[in-house]
């Protein structure tokens, strides 16, 4: 397996698809990187030359990927929670953040049902 940006990318897949195994690189960004470096997107990772791998590593240094990106996202969420805005509070309470209804739906975000005992007569 070739190692790019600290990630072992699969050898038998096309380089265009293999780059998407890196957190922060989707198909569009992968295609842009390959176009910029001049690497054929249809070539398999195992057939890449060392020079091509070095070009790809150099091109990926211009983007925020993997641990740095995860850290940035975590800090953005923490900032929202620290300033006490509605979005931060909703994140903290594990509720939908973007205005969706919660009376009936939002099961994924809220988790499994917690049964509350009924009132006795």
UniProtKB/Swiss-Prot annotation:
Looking at the keywords, is Signal present? no
One example of a Gene Ontology biological process annotation: translation
Q: Where is the composition biased (Basic residues)?
A: 100-121
Q: Which domain of life is it from?
A: Bacteria
InterPro entries reported in the protein's UniProt record: Rbsml_uS13_C (IPR027437), Ribosomal_uS13 (IPR001892), Ribosomal_uS13-like_H2TH (IPR010979), Ribosomal_uS13_bac-type (IPR019980), Ribosomal_uS13_CS (IPR018269)
GO CC field: cytosol; small ribosomal subunit
Offer an example of a GO molecular function term for this protein: rRNA binding
Tell me if Ribosomal protein is a UniProt keyword of this record.
Answer: yes
Task: Print the keywords alphabetically.
Answer: Ribonucleoprotein, Ribosomal protein, RNA-binding, rRNA-binding, tRNA-binding
Q: Where is this region: Disordered?
A: 97-121
The coiled-coil segments of this chain are none
Function description: Located at the top of the head of the 30S subunit, it contacts several helices of the 16S rRNA. In the 70S ribosome it contacts the 23S rRNA (bridge B1a) and protein L5 of the 50S subunit (bridge B1b), connecting the 2 subunits; these bridges are implicated in subunit movement. Contacts the tRNAs in the A and P-sites.
PANTHER family, per the entry: 30S RIBOSOMAL PROTEIN S13/40S RIBOSOMAL PROTEIN S18, SMALL RIBOSOMAL SUBUNIT PROTEIN US13M
Query: Which family would the database say this protein is a member of?
Result: Belongs to the universal ribosomal protein uS13 family.
Subunit structure, interactors included: Part of the 30S ribosomal subunit. Forms a loose heterodimer with protein S19. Forms two bridges to the 50S subunit in the 70S ribosome.
Name it.
Small ribosomal subunit protein uS13
Question: What species was this sequence derived from?
Answer: Synechococcus sp. (strain CC9605)
């Amino acid at each position: 397996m070739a190692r790019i940006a600290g990630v072992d990318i699969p050898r038998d897949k096309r380089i265009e698809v293999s780059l998407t195994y890196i957190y922060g690189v989707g198909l569009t960004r992968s295609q842009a990187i390959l176009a910029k470096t001049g690497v054929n997107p249809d070539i398999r990772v195992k057939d890449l030359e060392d020079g091509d791998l070095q070009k790809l590593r150099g091109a990926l240094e211009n983007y925020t990927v993997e641990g740095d990106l995860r850290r940035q996202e975590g800090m953005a969420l923490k900032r929202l929670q620290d300033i006490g805005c509605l979005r931060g509070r909703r994140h903290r309470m594990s509720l939908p953040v973007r205005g969706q209804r919660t009376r009936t739906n939002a099961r994924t975000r809220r988790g499994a049902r917690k049964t509350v005992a009924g009132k006795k007569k």
